[in-house]
């Protein structure tokens, strides 16, 4: 494949054009009066969304150089979404403002490396300042407030608040589609842990990037599974029963994993392989916990149970299992209730007895997993499109609530960012030359999110930025009510983790764009005849 290469200013300009195209599409969704974006789908009706990252994921540009810029900003949005579940639009708008301000200076002869260093230092300073000014979040109402801001829906916000309070900070909140029109909250017995599928080929729900197994059987294995002859007899028995299979083992590799993947692709057997969490004795103990929850047995050569000899009687079961790339949730395990209750009692006794803090902490983690249960938010809506959008916004709200409990909250509406400019004064004084200019670029960019929140609400962005800069900390524009005031009291808040991720991720991408000297892309294939582009000739 031959390549086309662009250099310095031309390369940067093209990348900037791509950054702008993507950011302009995403920024209309920012704020409580953010607009919707309609996405045409290859199959089925169009999707309507006001979630920045969903819009960003859909965009690929025709010009290969511009597309580089768009993909860079897309990575900012996705990264921020992965860490904090929200704040994607803020990150995108910040990145756009940084690229614009930075490239202006580079074109005027500033040193991009020094500029980039200044931008990074500024991002760190703002991130620290945000952390320092955060208000901790606890209690159902506070959590509900965060979730309400994220989902723009009070009822959903309160559901998330209730769910989080019930299952605790480490508890699992799972979001499912309901078969009715109502959105409701259920608490079920369930266990979640931080290990995801071993291969993306196991995914069954491509939009959510999850493998969902309904009414599966569960194989728990103490050691590695790599040889196919060991696993095959079990796979054949499970395939006959027609049930999906979840395998949790120290590791699944080689032929065994390859066979599971091939069967998943061919749809002959719905299976998902997951590594067991933790190490050594903790892993052993946790597998035993899972065995009790699911009503299965841990297959362990040490106790004379060999994988190739056992039948389906050692398998556990559950109502539903959801596996993503990072975690696994087992809902309503088939184990006996009293066995689980006894195990919980036993763990509590061990916690009382132990004198090692580390052991106590780990035992408490296991206890929380066993006793905490799973909150299931069942989302209902009138149409397929509305259901999708609603489910997305509940997932974002849960992520935002978790982030808020972790690091606290700051005033929302773009004002915390704008007011974090004060943290840059000292830094600016200690730097000189192009690094100091980098700090200026960053200070300028911090007004961008507020500018677009105000613009989307039909106000003059520049006026709003000027006004909020004069207000005391924690005060700003409430774009919902179109008034200025105390945002935290009004419940216009953002999790600090979300805002910080947006700041740090946008700075790292801007720095990349500024220091780009050469861009290399594939040469587009020439069309053999012009059927493909017939519509240009009318």
Curated annotation (Swiss-Prot):
Sample GO molecular function, one term: ATP binding
GO CC aspect terms: cytoplasm
Enzyme class of the recorded protein, top EC level: isomerase
Binding site for ATP: 29-32, 86-90, 413, 494
Enzyme Commission number(s) from the entry: 5.6.1.7
Subunit structure and binding partners: Forms a cylinder of 14 subunits composed of two heptameric rings stacked back-to-back. Interacts with the co-chaperonin GroES.
UniProt cross-references to NCBIfam families, sorted A to Z: GroEL (TIGR02348), PRK00013.1 (NF000592), PRK12849.1 (NF009487), PRK12850.1 (NF009488), PRK12851.1 (NF009489)
General function of this protein: Together with its co-chaperonin GroES, plays an essential role in assisting protein folding. The GroEL-GroES system forms a nano-cage that allows encapsulation of the non-native substrate proteins and provides a physical environment optimized to promote and accelerate protein folding.
Protein name (database record): Chaperonin GroEL 1
Organism of provenance: Mycolicibacterium paratuberculosis (strain ATCC BAA-968 / K-10) (Mycobacterium paratuberculosis)
Lineage, uppermost ranks: Bacteria, Bacillati, Actinomycetota, Actinomycetes, Mycobacteriales
């Amino acid at each position: 494949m031959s390549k086309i290469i662009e250099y310095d200013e031309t390369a940067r300009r093209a990348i900037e054009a791509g950054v702008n195209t993507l950011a302009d599409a995403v920024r209309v969704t920012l704020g409580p009066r953010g607009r919707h974006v309609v996405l045409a789908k290859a199959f089925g009706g169009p999707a309507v969304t006001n979630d920045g990252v969903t819009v960003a994921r859909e965009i690929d540009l025709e010009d290969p150089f511009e597309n580089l810029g768009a993909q860079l900003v897309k990575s900012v949005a996705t990264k921020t979404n992965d860490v904090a579940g929200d704040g994607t639009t803020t990150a995108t708008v910040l990145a756009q403002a940084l690229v614009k301000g930075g490239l202006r200076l580079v074109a005027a002869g500033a040193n991009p490396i020094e500029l980039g260093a200044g931008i990074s230092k500024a991002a760190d300073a703002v991130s620290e300042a945000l952390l320092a000014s955060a208000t901790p979040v606890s209690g159902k109402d506070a959590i509900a407030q965060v979730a309400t801001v994220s989902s723009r829906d009070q009822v959903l916000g309160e559901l998330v608040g209730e769910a989080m309070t019930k299952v605790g900070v480490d508890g699992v909140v799972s979001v499912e589609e309901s078969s009715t029109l109502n959105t409701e909250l259920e608490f079920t017995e369930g266990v979640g842990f931080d290990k995801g599928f071993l291969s993306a080929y196991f995914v069954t729900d491509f939009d959510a990037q999850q493998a969902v197994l309904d009414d599966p059987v569960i194989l728990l294995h103490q050691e590695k599974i790599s040889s196919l002859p060991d696993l095959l007899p079990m796979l054949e028995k499970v395939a006959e029963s027609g049930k999906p299979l979840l395998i949790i083992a120290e590791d699944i590799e080689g032929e065994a994993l390859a066979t599971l993947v091939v069967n998943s692709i061919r749809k002959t057997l719905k299976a998902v392989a997951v590594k067991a969490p933790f190490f050594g004795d903790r892993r052993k103990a946790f597998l035993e916990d899972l065995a009790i929850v699911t009503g299965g047995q841990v297959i362990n050569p040490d106790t004379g149970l060999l994988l190739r000899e056992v039948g389906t009687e050692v398998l556990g079961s559950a109502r539903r299992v959801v596996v993503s790339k990072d975690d696994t949730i087992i809902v309503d395990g088939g184990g006996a209730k009293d066995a689980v209750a006894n195990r919980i009692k036993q763990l509590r006794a061990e916690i009382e007895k132990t004198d090692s803090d580390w052991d106590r902490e780990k035992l408490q983690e296991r206890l929380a997993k066993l006793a905490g249960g799973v909150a299931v938010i069942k989302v209902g809506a009138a149409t397929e499109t509305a259901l999708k959008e609603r489910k997305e916004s509940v997932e974002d709200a849960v992520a935002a609530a978790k982030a808020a409990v972790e690091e606290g909250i700051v005033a929302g509406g773009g004002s915390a960012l704008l007011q974090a400019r004060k943290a840059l004064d000292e830094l600016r004084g200690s730097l000189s030359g192009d690094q100091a200019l980098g700090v200026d670029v960053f200070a300028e960019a911090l007004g961008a999110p507020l500018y677009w929140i105000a613009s989307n609400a039909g106000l003059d962005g520049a006026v709003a930025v000027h006004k909020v800069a004069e207000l005391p900390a924690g005060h700003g524009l409430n774009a919902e009510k179109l008034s200025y005031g105390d945002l935290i009291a009004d419940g216009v808040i953002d999790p600090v983790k979300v805002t910080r991720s947006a700041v740090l991720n946008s700075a790292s991408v801007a720095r990349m764009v500024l220091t780009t000297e050469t861009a290399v892309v594939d040469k587009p294939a020439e069309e053999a005849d012009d059927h493909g582009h017939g519509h240009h000739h009318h």
